Amino acid sequence: MQIVKITYADGRTEETRLTPRALCQAEEHAQINNWAAGDASRIRQSYYLAFIAMRNAGHTTLGFDEWMDTVEDIALEQKDPEPANPTL
């Protein structure tokens, strides 16, 4: 599963899973706002995806611009799911 880890300007970190809902919302937002496709707006799209994932998970109630003012960095990571219990 993919997760996004946010490092805020105050030094704290938070992470959440990138859900299909967040991916679709970020894509739709980019299309509606005529952001350049692909690598031409990759950074903005990455930060917006992180914002949507955090908002959907209940980690922020701020708008995108206000949230961006609090962010130091984002990192996308791949985490393997917990292995299933073979005794179940």
Regions found by a protein language model. Give the residues of each.
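Charged interaction scaffolds used for protein-protein
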Residues: 1-13, 21-88
